[in-house]
């Protein structure tokens, strides 16, 4: 379980990102912090869809649900190193207010000093998985290299 990677796509990326936070994430489940977080076209903020989800899915619940949290709001200085990517032509992220998605996550990671790699592709729409035949093709290899790099750095003795 040491230095494991947590991978999430789209809304699964949002759940993975929230799991990496202190408030409702891995500490509550008594598991180690992920060694790295790998995200493909993550939804950071469900934005205007939150009331719709509440109305359609959780009509009788007053408790907070996963969609009430933003990944960027869960980022603290001890958040795992994060690799994430998304496309400029991702119409789903545009529908959820584009600047509240990848750009907001990047700002939160930078503000908290969390190591990260962000790739923004011109032609990489939502739901393309490993992205064969798009500008994002090869992202999974890049993400694995980021994971290896972060794991190697974490295992070096402190100076």
Residue ranges and their predicted role:
Residues 1-159:
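Alpha/beta-hydrolase superfamily serine-hydrolase fold, recognizing
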């Amino acid at each position: 379980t040491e230095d494991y990677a947590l991978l999430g796509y789209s809304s699964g990326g949002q759940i993975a990102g929230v799991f990496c936070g202190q408030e409702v994430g891995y500490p509550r489940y008594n598991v180690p912090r992920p060694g790295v977080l790998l995200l493909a076209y993550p939804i950071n903020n469900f934005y205007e869809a939150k009331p719709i989800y509440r109305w359609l899915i959780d009509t009788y619940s007053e408790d907070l649900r996963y969609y009430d949290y933003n990944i960027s709001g869960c980022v603290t200085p001890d958040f795992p190193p994060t690799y994430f990517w998304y496309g400029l032509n991702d119409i789903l992220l545009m529908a959820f207010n584009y600047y509240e998605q990848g750009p907001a996550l990047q700002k939160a990671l930078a503000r908290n000093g969390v190591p990260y790699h962000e790739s923004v592709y011109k032609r990489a729409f939502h739901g393309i998985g490993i992205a064969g035949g798009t500008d994002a093709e090869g992202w999974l290899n890049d993400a694995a290299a980021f994971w290896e790099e972060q794991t190697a750095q974490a295992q070096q003795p402190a100076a």
